[in-house]
Amino acid sequence: MARQSDHRACGFSRRGFFGLASTAAGLFIREAWAGSRKGRLIGSDPALLSPFEREHFPSLSLPPRTRNGAKVPIVVEMSHPMTPDHQVTSLEVVNETDPIPGKGRFHFTPGNGAIYVAFQARMDEGDSEVTVTADCNRHGRWQIRRRISIPEGAGGCAGEAPAWGRVAGDDIHSPEIRIPEQVQRGGIRRGEVIHPQLKIRHPNRTGLAEHDGSFVRASEPLYLEKMEVRFGGEAVSKFEFTPALSDDPFITFALLASREGSLEVRLVNNRGQRFETAHEISFS
């Protein structure tokens, strides 16, 4: 049975109620035009979408069932243009019935070249739905939703944060950047969209504990809060994470290799600790 949240202590929504109330299909897609609160439900078969709709709806990949709620892989990508006058400016990933619903908000620019982000997040046990909302600067918000099932006892939302003085040494390692296109082909071509991968050893804990079937606050959380991507001295992306981020995350994003230059990634956790790394982009 799914645990209930302690509303007085944390203000978290109940998974049990929403699980019983939801009768939607495993996948549904909704369009919400800018300036309008009205939406439109579309069938679960993406092949039925028009080219315009396929361009605007995000693609969400995650396991339909997993036994590791502490590290659920999430991949979001889109075929939407990324030009100054027509672009997706942000994505948001949410599981509304989790004790920490928000999984991350991701801001993009034409410097990304494409919409792509992959990361890992904590989710609670039981049946739930993950929603991705994409914001187009011309056509407003577009949503996709997929179901996920995590067996009882396999949820990943509980976890006390280590004390300030205990986060050092082997607990945290500096971030590293890997460019898979460079590794596979030995070089990068001008104008292609590459997919840098960022690896960092860093604990990310919600600060929640389970007590009598409810989540209660046991400690302050510890987590990577922000990640900024710069290329050639210009801002490309800003990612905002929550305590639902998994330990030692492996984060992938898109970058338009429009020129040679330094790719820089800067991170900060909620305790103000900063981490950064750089990788030189050069053409073969």
What residue ranges belong to the model's regions?
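Short acidic/polar inter-strand loop motif in beta-rich domains
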Residues: D135-I144, N269-T277
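N-terminal secretory signal peptides
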Residues: M1-F12, A25
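Surface-exposed, short loops/turns at beta-strand junctions within beta-sandwich domains
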Residues: Q120-D127, L255-E260
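N-terminal edge beta-strand
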Residues: P46-K71, V167-R190
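N-terminal export leaders
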Residues: F12-F28
